[in-house]
Amino acid sequence: MTSEFFSAQLRAQISDDTTHPISYYKPEFYMPDDGGTAHLSVVAEDGSAVSATSTINLYFGSKVRSPVSGILLNNEMDDFSSTSITNEFGVPPSPANFIQPGKQPLSSMCPTIMVGQDGQVRMVVGAAGGTQITMATALAIIYNLWFGYDVKWAVEEPRLHNQLLPNVTTVERNIDQEVTAALETRHHHTQITSTFIAVVQAIVRMAGGWAAASDSRKGGEPAGY
């Protein structure tokens, strides 16, 4: 998945002036939704960094709480695909995600540490939000490293999301109308989300130290000393 050849194949399918029907992207399998996730980005005094995403899968996991520890138990096994379940678009489950001994289910989680050519950590970032995690994390990276937004702006900027199945581009309510219009010009079917798209936590190296942002979509605030 990280090879330049695979990236080039995906890039070749992108058209700047239009989107395409689902069949153009040749979706072979679908992945179940997930949720009940939290992310933490940390940088220590010595410059070492941790990007950690944890999950109990769905909201409140298995909805079972240990009477001894009070800890909610997860239902992570539900993240595996079932051989007998096809989604509403008629796309079969992925064999790569079937249950096998010693195997972990596929996940949208992508805790990320960006490192410069000098070997120094430049950005620590990740998100919670089920299938929206990957795009939300990528957008924060793009806004900061490519567009030069400060870390707070990169995290707070209104987001969009499309996971192909369903082929609907979801946008946050406060997104710039020019963005929505440009998407529709390219034949995207847009839909305003009733809530928000993922929750991002990020830390970025600055000339004089570090800057951190915790997504206000979930009432977060960064902490440091």
From Swiss-Prot:
Record InterPro entries: GGT_CS, GGT_peptidase, GGT_ssub, Ntn_hydrolases_N
* Residues annotated to bind L-glutamate: T55, E76, S107, S108, G129, G130
GO BP annotation list: glutathione catabolic process; leukotriene D4 biosynthetic process
- Annotated SUPFAM superfamilies: N-terminal nucleophile aminohydrolases (Ntn hydrolases) (SSF56235)
User: What is the similarity comment for this entry?
Assistant: Belongs to the gamma-glutamyltransferase family.
Further remarks about this protein from its record: Corresponds to the light chain of other gamma-glutamyltransferase family members. Has no catalytic activity.
UniProt-recorded name of the protein = Glutathione hydrolase light chain 1
